[in-house]
Structures are given as C-alpha cells and as structure tokens.
Design a protein with these regions (language model features):
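N-terminal Rossmann-like NAD(P)+-binding domain of SDR-like oxidoreductases, especially those catalyzing
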Residues: 2-197
Length: 197
C-alpha cells in the first residue's frame, strides 16, 4: 500500500476544507491538484482517480509526500464508494474533471464514454446532494465545480444556438445536462466556460 493510500484512510481534519478532485492524475487534473496542494496547505486534497489510460501518478511525484495530499483509487461511477468517501472525509468541495476523453476513443468505445461521462457525473452529483443534504448546515459553503470540454458543442460560433456533434460531444453534453439537475439543490449556480482560441 502506498503512502498516499495509507494517508487516505485517516479521518478528516477539522477546521480545513476537504476537497475531492476527480481525475487528478490526468494531464489537466494533475495541474489542478498540484496548485491546490501547494497553495492551500490548510486544505485536505483527495485525488480520486481510476488510473485509466489518461491517469498517471508520476504526474504528481512532486506532491505525493505532502501531508495534505491523499490519493484514492476509485471509479466515479461507483456511487457507494464516492458517497462513503464524502462521509468519511467530510467533503465540502468537489472539482470534477474525471472523464473519458479523445474523440477517436469515443468512436471505438461509446459505451465506456457514456458510462463515465454521463453516469459518472450523475454519481458525483447525487453523492454530493445526499451527503450535503444530510448536514445541519445543508449546502452552506459547499461547492461542486464541473470542468468540461470545448468539444461538447463542437465547432460552433459563440453566437450559434447550442448543438452537438456526436459521438464524443453527445456524451460530454449529457453530463453537462445533468448539472441542470444539480442546480435544483445547490444554492449557487456558478458557471465558468473557458473557450479555445
């Protein structure tokens, strides 16, 4: 068992923010994890990653021994595991980056893409909803950030009505549509949409 997996079995520390970053061993996710681990030493960062073709813990060698970094090997589609982690670590923030990527792979294996990008996002939302709803303060101070891709809507002009180009974008946009479900119970609707040049 690695040091990080041992550390992840400890209970949550009081007085800190406890944040899950999904897909934290991926290219973009590892940069987000590194930023949070180094910038917010009072936050406990839980890198939840399945370690598929896109995930590589070597991306995080420089932070793996930091006391506020914890690796959790798990699948975002495993609702029970995600929900248990949220309860055990008293999670109050989620940065959701985990997703199947690469358009070519979506053509070869559309079911895996749909399972991860659609049902995985729904699993994360539902775990957050149920856990945060059970707390006395409910959703106060809680945050769920879903990071997506510019491929959701394909090659559209910014003024074009939303549309999708299958198959990759269909699965990615389905995950985004589940966020409409999330706005029914989260108190704030914070949106940030990066654009490719």
């Amino acid at each position: 068992m690695s040091t990080n997996q041992t550390k992840s079995s400890q209970g949550a520390k009081k007085g800190t923010r406890n944040i899950i970053i999904t897909g934290g061993a991926g290219f973009i996710g590892s940069h987000v994890v590194r930023l949070f681990v180094n910038k917010y030493s009072d936050y406990e960062i839980y890198n939840l990653d399945k370690l598929t073709y896109a995930g590589n813990l070597a991306n995080l060698k420089d932070v793996e021994d930091k006391p506020n970094y914890h690796f959790v090997k798990a699948d975002i589609c495993d609702f029970e595991r995600v929900y248990a982690l949220m309860q055990e670590k008293e999670i109050d923030g989620i940065i959701h980056l985990a997703a199947e990527s690469h358009v070519d792979r979506s053509i070869k294996d559309p079911f895996t893409f749909a399972q991860t990008n659609v049902m995985g996002t729904l699993s994360m939302l539902q775990a957050a909803k149920l856990y945060w709803e059970s707390l006395p303060e409910k959703w106060e101070g809680k945050r769920f950030y879903h990071i997506s891709t510019d491929e959701v809507y394909g090659a559209l002009e910014m003024t074009h009505p939303a549309g999708v180009e299958p198959p990759f974008s269909t699965k990615a946009s389905s995950g985004e549509h589940h966020l409409a479900y999330g706005t029914k119970f989260f108190t704030e609707d914070l949106k940030y949409q990066p654009h490719s040049p």
